[in-house]
């Protein structure tokens, strides 16, 4: 089980999801549900200026296998002064090296970690904390199943894959309850705590954050190993500002109710 100092604040990663050159948000990760929010660089710079230390940058076209926004994402990464976590369509050595060549601090690997365990183990060994593994999951008939290829294929049973990744020495996991993503109905705290308890790797929460209370709830389990959270639609929809979210997370770390 991963454990973290109680006084450490939850790290927030504002998301910039890119499709067809635009910053967009999806509902439950489904292609065709995009809402456009304009130029990705404007969104990323806005979050940087608001105090973000990380940006979660996603190439949705690459994730869905329908194209690439690589040059644009490379340009965005190059213009930022904060850490970038890059995700979407990273499935082999070539695409991994290409992603890291943008200057990003970390890449997320999803589908390939499910479909090619040997390659996944090699990547974990070679790249260490430059690689996080994304576990996108949905409850099906009472069982947590993983989703791959832009959430369109089955990737196996969550706990079996988690045991394998933990034994391979995975350095970080990004956990998404697909049913919560883009729905603004709260993160699945119980699932996140269960995953954190089953691994030594720190967990990044993704999907469902809708309020400052959600931020506080996640910040309250940092010491259990859920040390970061990706925030997307709630910020774009104006549910709260990034400044407010950062203050809420820091308030929990300080032991005050803000």
Curated annotation (Swiss-Prot):
It is found in: Cytoplasm. Pathway: Amino-acid biosynthesis; L-histidine biosynthesis; L-histidine from 5-phospho-alpha-D-ribose 1-diphosphate: step 4/9. The active site is at residues 17, 136. Keywords: Amino-acid biosynthesis, Cytoplasm, Histidine biosynthesis, Isomerase. It catalyses: 1-(5-phospho-beta-D-ribosyl)-5-[(5-phospho-beta-D-ribosylamino)methylideneamino]imidazole-4-carboxamide = 5-[(5-phospho-1-deoxy-D-ribulos-1-ylimino)methylamino]-1-(5-phospho-beta-D-ribosyl)imidazole-4-carboxamide. The keyword Cytoplasm applies. GO terms for biological process: L-histidine biosynthetic process; L-tryptophan biosynthetic process. It comes from the Bacteria. One of its GO terms (cellular component) is cytoplasm. Its EC number is 5.3.1.16. The keyword Glycoprotein does not apply. GO terms for molecular function: 1-(5-phosphoribosyl)-5-[(5-phosphoribosylamino)methylideneamino]imidazole-4-carboxamide isomerase activity; phosphoribosylanthranilate isomerase activity. Belongs to the HisA/HisF family. This is 1-(5-phosphoribosyl)-5-[(5-phosphoribosylamino)methylideneamino] imidazole-4-carboxamide isomerase.
């Amino acid at each position: 089980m991963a454990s973290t100092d109680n006084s450490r604040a939850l790290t927030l990663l504002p998301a910039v999801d890119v499709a067809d050159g635009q910053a967009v948000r999806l509902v439950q990760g489904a292609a065709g549900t995009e809402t456009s929010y304009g130029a990705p660089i404007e969104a990323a710079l806005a979050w940087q200026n608001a105090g973000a230390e990380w940006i979660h940058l996603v190439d949705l076209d690459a994730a869905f296998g329908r194209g690439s926004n690589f040059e644009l994402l490379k340009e965005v990464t190059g213009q930022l002064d904060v850490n970038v976590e890059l995700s979407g369509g990273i499935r082999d050595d070539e695409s991994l090296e290409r992603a890291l060549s943008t200057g990003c601090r970390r890449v997320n690997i999803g589908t390939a970690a499910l479909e090619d365990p040997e390659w996944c183990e090699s990547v974990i060994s070679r790249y260490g904390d430059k690689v996080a593994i994304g576990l996108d999951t949905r409850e099906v008939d009472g069982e947590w199943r993983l989703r791959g290829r832009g959430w369109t294929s089955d990737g196996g049973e969550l706990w079996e894959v988690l045991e394998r990744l933990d034994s391979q020495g995975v350095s970080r996991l990004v956990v998404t309850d697909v049913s919560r993503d883009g729905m603004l109905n709260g993160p699945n705290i119980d699932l996140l705590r269960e995953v954190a308890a089953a691994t030594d790797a720190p967990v990044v929460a993704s999907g469902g954050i809708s309020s400052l209370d959600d931020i506080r709830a996640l910040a309250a389990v940092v010491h259990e190993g859920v040390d970061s959270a990706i925030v997307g639609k709630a910020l774009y929809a104006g549910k709260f500002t990034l400044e407010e979210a950062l203050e809420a997370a820091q308030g929990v770390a300080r032991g005050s109710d803000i």
